[in-house]
Each structure stands twice: as C-alpha cells, then as structure tokens.
Amino acid sequence: MKAIAYYTSLPINDPQALQDIELPEPVAGPRDLLVEVKAISVNPVDTKVRQNVSPEGGAAKVLGWDAAGVVKAVGSEVSLFKAGDKVYYAGSIARAGANSELHVVDERIVGHMPKSLGFAEAAALPLTAITAWELLFERLQIGEGNAAEGQSLLIVGAAGGVGSILTQLASQLTALKVIGTASRAQTRSWVEALGADLVIDHSQPLSEELKRAGQPNVTHVASLTQTDLHFAQLVEALAPQGKLALIDDPKALDITQLKRKSLSLHWEFMYTRSLFETADMLEQHKLLNRVAELIDAGTLKTTVGEHFGTINATN
C-alpha cells in the first residue's frame, strides 16, 4: 500500500523530510478495524513526533492521527462496527499513523462519522473534539445542562482548533458563562460566532482584561496555549477553589502559587486512554458518536481549515 513516512528527523523543507513509500498492508488484530483512509488532517502532534522521534533500525515511521474513512474489514472480536461503515478517529500515538491507504485502529477509540459531513470535514474533528470534550466534562468535571450559580469558564486560545470546539461545547451544552480569548478582530468575531459570552484580548494581562469586562474572576480555566506565559495571571483570575486545565507543554510552572486559593491543576492528553489501554477506552468511542450526533443536529460545526487535496508527501 502507499504511505507517507520519514526515516530520520529533518527540517520540513528538506526534500527527504517526508517520503512517499510502499508498505505491506496491515492486518487487523482482534479489536481492530482495517480502515480504507479517505482523508487525514495535520495537527501539532505530527510536527512534534517528526521533530523529536527518530525511527529505530532504519524503519519508516508513518504519521497522521486524525482520519476518516471506510471500514474494509474487522477483527475477530469487533462488535461496534462492520465492513462498509464510515468512521472517524484520532488513533493512537503508540501505533502507526493514518497517512496511508489502509490503517488499523482499535474500535474502542473510533466513532461513526457524522452523516452530514464529507470525509475531509470529518477528519478535522476527532483530535480536537476528544481533547475539548475530555477537558470540559472529565478534567474540569462540568456537568451537561447545568452549572452552579456564578460558574464561568475562561478559554485561553479560544479561536484555535481545540478552543473552537471547546467554546461550542461549553456554550451549547452547559450553563457556564464562557469567556474566550483572541487578539485579532477576525478571531474575536470567530469566537463570538461560536457562542462565547465575552471575548477578551490575551495579548494583554488577562486578569485586568477580565476586570475591564466586568468579570472579576472565573471558576474554571482551560489554558490551551502559552500556559507558562499566562500562569500568574490565571492564578490571579481564578476564584478560590477554582480549577485550571491545560493541554500544552510549559517548561515549568510554580504550582505553589495554587496553594493559597486551594486551586486544582488538571492535564488533558487525549492519547492517555489508547497509550495505556485504560479500562475506559470505550469512552472515546461514545464521545465521538455523541459529537457526530451534535454535528448532524447543527449544534456543533466542524473546524476544517484548508483542504490540500491528495494525500501525499508534497501536500
């Protein structure tokens, strides 16, 4: 089968950084689906892996952890899907990526594709949707449909991929007051259109921006970018016993700043379940199906950016 891979970590402008190659067709394990890949999306994780992980023994490493396609075959213990089903998923970083004609993935982290979307639009969703969903409902433990009086969520980086889904989930499915951050007129308008109640400028001190907007503090924070830069401001902005969740990789955080207010810190990494094969892996299947229902109902919208055409090393 055709695939896109790399053999050594090189700058992306190097002609050998990514190569079109031929690989044997993968074989589905007992809980696996063999998927004919129709579309993939590119995420920061692709760049991080390519820059930091060199394949061993001259092997080719295939990237790609957001995909949509059609089930070609199923493993002996598969119960959730059948051949011909349209699916979407983010896969596992412990296995080969989906930048290939065929791909194997555990059924427990796969969802039925939204009926109203094409493959490219669907492939843009899984990683960001899983991250946003787990952060909101599992790490921050926000309940659907209600929130205690005065509860609020500050989303730092609300116009990005995860932020765009998170803003929609929080505004559509909870009673939280949603405050997003954006620094340009275009992104401010985007975040407002996604349902944020307030939009503040993250190029300015966040606690001061909140006060100017009439929001002296917040009960929850989702820090999606530059957490180390904003950390002191986020601690100041959080109400006592508030919760801070993050997804990025800050170099160092002085968490002793959290003690005085009894603040809690939560990390969200959507690959944890598949990486460690946790007992609740099936939750990602369930949430992807729920996201598909919300997309088809018009409650959520996809965040596909630019379509690059055929899947190959050049693109």
Predicted regions, residues:
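Short, glycine/polar-rich helix-capping loops at beta-to-alpha or helix-loop-helix junctions
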Residues: A98-N99, S183-W190, A252-I255
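Glycine-rich cofactor phosphate-binding loops and adjacent beta1-alpha1 units
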Residues: E144-N146, L194, L198-E268
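Glycine-rich beta-strand-centered segment in the early N-terminal region that forms part
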Residues: P24-S41, Q51-A94
